[in-house]
Amino acid sequence: MSTTPGRKFFDEHLDYIFKGDLDGMIDKQYTEDAVLISPFDILDTPPPHIVRGRAALKAFFRKYMDYQGAINVESLYDFAETEDAISFQAVFTSKTGKWVVGDAWYMRDGMIAYHFSFAHNIGGAA
């Protein structure tokens, strides 16, 4: 259950992912000029990847979800928020294995302007 504005935003973010509504997630939660820095090795060039703008984010997240498949969040911890930032760590499993991830979102006008992603595979397929 959401108890704070940041947690509500996070819960909505996961809901978009679980429903497969990546376009909705990007359009409603990321600024038009948003930047994602990702460690996931899913593009033709090695990571880290710097992805800019909604169109590129949509393409990246589609590849990312194809790579991961269904995601099962096992734990969420170190969740923190301020008026312009949200950060958290989580453990999840997917078809690529078990991951420890961390994300930091810098917010502008209630949307993600900068998304910093960190990840380490701790077991499984990847």
Stretches with model-predicted labels:
Residues 1-10, 44-51, 100-106:
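Charged, low-complexity, helix/coiled-coil-prone segments
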Residues 2-35:
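Short acidic-aromatic low-complexity motifs
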Residues 5, 58-126:
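A beta-strand edge to alpha-helix "cap/lid" segment located at domain peripheries
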Residues 9-10, 14, 18-20, 41-45, ...:
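Generic preference for well-ordered secondary structure
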Residues 23, 27-78, 82:
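A solvent-exposed, acidic/Ser-Thr-rich amphipathic alpha-helical stretch
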